[in-house]
């Protein structure tokens, strides 16, 4: 980072997205490996995505092993560097908030604004790469299902709706001994929403399953039918996770039209056309999904749970806490996937 006494040494670039670059870095004082994401704030949409991620991760008062942890956020303007805190009245921070709210740059465009997020470093790529480069493993599937349901329950408990759950946004940290299953971390909170309390008791935490959102966002193959309509709650995250788990268990893949990369994702086939599950259910809520596609890919309880998670009616889906409990029961009470 740009400072008279840098805290981090950037080692190499490990990823590049639409609004930022991610580096592997070392903490100078401890030699700890971290990931540093640099976001250039030259466009209002970049600022909004960055601030959404910052607000979501900084709102969490505790850590969870399966949710990416943000160590700190540093704001850089030209030669000035300042640690950014949520709710700050800093003259550097407020123009970014104004930019996000108005949708237009609220600072001198000649200034170079950057945000630096310091987060956990994950050395195993993303879930998509990990699953598709290895043979199917019941042990891995079970571990990943439990980790992801635990992460989602934690986020919803903290009033955060992710809104873009997909394998590309789930990072993998390899186990140190190479024997245990890797640790997953839900990441990329640029589209997330922190639900605030309202009504008669503002001190009471918001119920994410009753907080309705209207901005249709996410990635089409993981979007719930109600998201396409623009009227949804946290149950949309349950649907997205249902698509992910279904695709993981049966190795169902789609092809990214831009990169030609194979991705884990469920779909409905219409002749030669591949249609996102949510879009198909929006058009026909009574559509019966073919789960499982492969006869012995899952047991009866898992089949029933996936049908519930992928229901066209959000009220018929379990909430994140019910889902976590159901998956624990499936993992530890069922000894075979064929019953």
UniProtKB/Swiss-Prot annotation:
Reactions it catalyzes: L-seryl-[protein] + ATP = O-phospho-L-seryl-[protein] + ADP + H(+); L-threonyl-[protein] + ATP = O-phospho-L-threonyl-[protein] + ADP + H(+)
Domain Protein kinase residues, every copy: 8-332
Recorded GO CC terms: cytoplasm; nucleus
Keyword Kinase: yes
Entries under Pfam families matching the protein: Pkinase
This protein's UniProt keywords: ATP-binding, Kinase, Nucleotide-binding, Nucleus, Serine/threonine-protein kinase, Transferase
Active site as annotated: 164
Entry's Gene Ontology BP terms: negative regulation of G2/M transition of mitotic cell cycle; negative regulation of G2/MI transition of meiotic cell cycle
EC assignment: 2.7.11.1
Positions of ATP binding: 14-22, 37
UniProt-annotated location(s): Nucleus
Superkingdom in the source lineage: Eukaryota
PANTHER family in the record: EUKARYOTIC TRANSLATION INITIATION FACTOR 2-ALPHA KINASE EIF2-ALPHA KINASE -RELATED, SERINE_THREONINE-PROTEIN KINASE PDIK1L
Similarity comment: family membership: Belongs to the protein kinase superfamily. Ser/Thr protein kinase family.
Protein name per UniProt: Serine/threonine-protein kinase pdik1l-A
Species the sequence originates in: Xenopus laevis
């Amino acid at each position: 980072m740009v400072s008279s006494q840098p805290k981090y040494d950037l080692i190499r670039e490990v990823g590049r997205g639409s609004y930022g670059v991610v580096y592997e870095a070392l903490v100078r004082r401890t030699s700890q490996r971290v990931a540093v994401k640099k976001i250039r704030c030259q466009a209002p949409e970049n600022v909004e995505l960055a601030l959404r991620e910052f607000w979501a991760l900084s709102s969490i008062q505790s850590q969870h092993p399966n949710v990416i942890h943000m160590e700190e956020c540093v704001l850089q303007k030209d030669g000035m560097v300042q640690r950014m805190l949520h709710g700050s009245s800093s003259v550097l921070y407020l123009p970014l908030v104004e930019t996000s709210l108005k949708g237009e740059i609220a600072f001198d465009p000649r200034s170079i604004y950057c945000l630096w997020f310091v987060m956990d470093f994950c050395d195993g790529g993303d879930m998509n790469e990990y699953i598709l480069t290895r043979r199917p493993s019941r042990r891995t599937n079970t571990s990943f299902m439990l980790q992801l349901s635990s992460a989602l329950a934690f986020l919803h408990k903290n009033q955060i709706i992710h809104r873009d759950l997909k394998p590309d946004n789930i990072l993998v940290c390899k186990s140190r001994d190479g024997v245990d299953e890797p640790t997953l971390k839900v990441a990329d909170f640029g589209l997330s929403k922190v639900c605030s309390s309202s009504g008669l008791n503002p001190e009471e935490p918001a119920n994410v399953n009753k907080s309705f959102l209207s901005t249709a966002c996410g990635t089409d193959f993981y979007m719930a039918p109600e998201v396409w309509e623009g009227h949804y709650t946290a149950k949309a995250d349950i649907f997205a996770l249902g698509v992910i788990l279904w695709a993981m268990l049966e190795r169902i893949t789609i092809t990214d039209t831009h990169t030609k990369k194979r991705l884990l994702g469920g779909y409905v086939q219409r002749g030669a056309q591949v249609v996102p599950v949510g879009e198909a259910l929006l058009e026909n809520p009574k559509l019966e999904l073919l789960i499982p596609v492969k006869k012995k890919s899952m047991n009866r309880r898992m089949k029933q749970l996936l049908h519930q998670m992928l229901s066209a009616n959000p009220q018929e889906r379990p909430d994140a806490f019910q889902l976590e409990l159901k998956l624990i029961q499936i993992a530890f009470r069922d000894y075979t996937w064929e019953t």
